[in-house]
């Protein structure tokens, strides 16, 4: 009975990946090699994928492909490409200990580690999110350059301000930054 339940769950999950926008992206007869994708500017628009878990899964697949490709090419002191991850909390979500399931926390940890390591292979990563507290703390810690625009919520200001080694006064000032102004660390 357990085996049939697992089979049914897997079939349902795989079937859901084969329909709609996900199906057009994942269930194809011909794919584009990662080498070709990285040879030009490319945008992966995932708006049609409504489920955050599926978005994280697709982004994770792309990230693993990118990581393995750069790793196989060897280390580089030259910037070979930049990956921009908007609304990064979908991939690098802050899951407080005790919440969520272990596989999600493990996956998030692996993604954070991959992002930290991939820089040594010449890959730049730009992590963008409007709510710092939604991001895994390792993501914030592992970024080399931090840029923050006006941030109103106190918990978000404290989170990013601490990562930027700001004084309490500087953290408070983040709520009054004008449009186009930012703090950089």
Language-model regions, residue ranges each:
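Conserved ATP-driven motor cores of ASCE-family P-loop NTPases powering translocation/secretion/packaging/pilus
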Residues: 106-185
């Amino acid at each position: 009975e357990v085996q049939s339940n697992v089979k049914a769950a897997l079939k349902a999950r795989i079937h859901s990946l084969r329909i709609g926008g996900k199906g057009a992206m994942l269930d194809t007869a011909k794919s584009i090699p990662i080498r070709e994708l990285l040879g030009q500017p490319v945008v992966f628009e995932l708006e049609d994928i409504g489920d955050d878990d599926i978005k994280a899964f697709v982004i994770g697949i792309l990230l693993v492909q990118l990581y393995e490709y750069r790793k196989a090419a060897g280390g580089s002191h030259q910037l070979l490409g930049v990956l921009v991850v908007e609304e990064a909390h979908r991939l690098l979500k802050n899951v407080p200990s005790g919440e969520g399931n272990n596989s999600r926390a493990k996956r998030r940890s692996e993604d954070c580690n991959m992002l930290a390591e991939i820089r040594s292979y010449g890959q730049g990563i730009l992590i963008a999110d409007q709510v710092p507290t939604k991001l895994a703390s390792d993501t914030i810690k592992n970024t080399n350059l931090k840029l923050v625009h006006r941030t109103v919520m106190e918990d978000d200001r404290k989170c990013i301000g601490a990562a930027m080694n700001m004084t309490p006064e500087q953290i408070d000032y983040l709520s009054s930054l004008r449009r186009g102004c930012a703090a950089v660390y």
